[in-house]
Amino acid sequence: MIDISSLAKRMVEQSKNPQKKIQPHNSLHKSDFKFLYVIGKGGFGRVWKIQSKKTKTKYALKEMSKVRIIDKKSEKSINSEREFLSKLNHPFIVNMHYAFQDKDNLYLVMDLLNGGDLRFHISRYRKFSEEQTRFFIANMIYALEYIHENNVIHRDIKPENLVLEDKGYCRITDFGIAKENMPDNS
């Protein structure tokens, strides 16, 4: 039997980078990217599969309408999500690479994951083997441990916010209702 937790731990150790801080990029514009197609829609806009024209790297781009954000009184939530993602970088979360805006929209350029969310896989397969379940749980534990070490509480762990990558690793996404862990949050 494969030791799932040591496999996940080894991936974390191999990919440890100095923590990167992502700052909003005033010099970036959506014209720096080739928009390939829409991969999702949400309350504020669309999620695109894009490619950097400079590096050819593919990403997911969250395009959010400023008007919709204001109409739904969600400025604080969107700003918090961007702020949390700008300080987090881990192999088991969906990482943000860039953040920028134009007069109409806010943009978050994030890791592109093609494996679908866990809700889709649960509805498709109905159940997972014990080994696969342990593997997903180990991924989530490492991600949550890292998130908590950085004083962030996710507050919305559910199958739709757990996305699989091509190699089968599970990553946490959607920090929209996350909160900073303050001493009085205990």
Q: What spans do the regions from the language model cover?
A:
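Eukaryotic serine/threonine protein kinase catalytic domain
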Residues: 24-186
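Intrinsically disordered, low-complexity regulatory segments that flank or precede the catalytic domain
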Residues: 1-26
